[in-house]
A protein has these predicted regions:
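P-loop NTPase motor domains
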Residues: 2-5, 9-237
Length: 238
C-alpha cells in the first residue's frame, strides 16, 4: 500500500494503464528491465474537505495539543496555554471531537481561570483571546471539516486488493494553507507511529508514504518541535 499527497492534482493517472513514450522507453532501457508491462493500480482518493475524495476526519483529542498548536500557528507560550486547557478536559473526562468543542473548552477555561490557576498554572485572558482568534481563522480555512466523527482508522490506509492500494490525498485545496497541510501530514505520521505494532524487519514495507513539498513540515519550526518530529520519523524508519 502507498500513501501519496497530491498538491497539483496530477497523480490520478495511476488508475489507468500507462502508455509508451520515448521517456519511458529510455528509462526501461537504462534500468535494464525485461518484459516490462504497463498496468493500472487500485486507487482510493481522500480529501479532508470531502470534495476530491473520501473525507478524512479525526478528533481534537486524537490530534493532541502539540500538533493542534501547529495548525493554529501558536507560539510556545500559547501552546502551553492550550496544553493546560486540554489537560483540564482530560482530567474531567470531557471529549473533544471538533472545533466547536474546542471553542467551548477555551471559553470555559477563560471564564473560570481563577479556579484553575493554582493547580494548572497561569491563564491569561489575552492568550485565551489569541487561541480563539486562531481557531476562528482555522475554521475559515475549512479545517473544521476534518474534525469530528467518525474518525479515520489508520488501517484503512493499509489495505490490499491483490495489489497494494494507492491512497491519494487530494491536497490541491489543502495546500493553499501550508501550515494546515504540514500539520495534517505530521498527524498522519504520528498516528502511524502510535497505532502500528512493532514487527521488526519485514521483507516489504507495511506502507510507503510520499509527501509532496515535505519541506513544509520543517519551515519556520522551533527547535523543540523539530526534535520531536525528527524522533518520530527516525522511529518509523527503523
Amino acid at each position: 500500500p502507498v500513501f501519496l499527497a497530491d498538491v497539483k492534482g496530477d497523480l490520478a493517472g495511476t488508475t489507468l494503464k500507462g502508455e509508451e513514450n520515448e521517456n519511458v522507453k529510455n528509462r526501461i532501457s537504462k534500468l535494464k528491465i525485461e518484459d516490462f508491462e504497463y498496468k493500472s493500480f487500485p486507487v482510493r482518493f481522500w480529501d479532508i474537505f470531502g470534495i476530491g475524495g473520501h473525507p478524512i476526519r479525526t478528533t481534537i483529542d486524537e490530534v493532541g495539543p502539540d500538533i493542534l498548536s501547529m495548525m493554529l500557528g501558536l507560539s510556545e507560550a500559547q501552546e502551553g496555554m492550550l496544553n493546560i486547557a486540554c489537560k483540564i478536559a482530560k482530567d474531567n473526562n470531557w471529549k473533544l471531537d471538533d472545533t466547536k468543542d474546542l471553542r467551548l473548552l477555551i471559553q470555559y477555561v477563560g471564564d473560570n481561570k481563577n479556579d484553575f490557576i493554582t493547580q494548572y498554572g497561569n491563564i491569561t485572558t489575552q492568550t485565551i483571546g489569541v487561541i480563539q482568534r486562531c481557531r476562528l481563522a482555522l475554521e475559515n480555512q475549512g479545517a473544521d471539516k476534518c474534525f469530528g466523527q467518525p474518525e479515520l482508522d489508520i488501517n484503512d490506509l493499509i489495505q490490499t486488493n491483490e495489489k497494494g492500494i494507492i491512497n491519494i490525498l487530494h491536497a490541491v485545496e489543502l495546500f493553499k494553507s501550508p501550515d494546515l497541510y504540514a500539520s495534517f501530514l505530521l498527524w498522519l505520521l504520528t498516528n502511524l507511529y502510535s497505532k502500528m505494532p512493532e514487527v521488526g524487519d519485514l521483507e516489504k514495507p507495511k506502507i510507503v508514504f510520499f509527501f509532496d513539498e515535505a519541506h513544509l513540515l520543517f519551515n519556520g519550526m522551533p527547535n523543540y518541535r523539530l526534535k520531536q518530529i525528527t524522533q518520530v520519523v527516525k522511529l518509523i524508519n527503523d
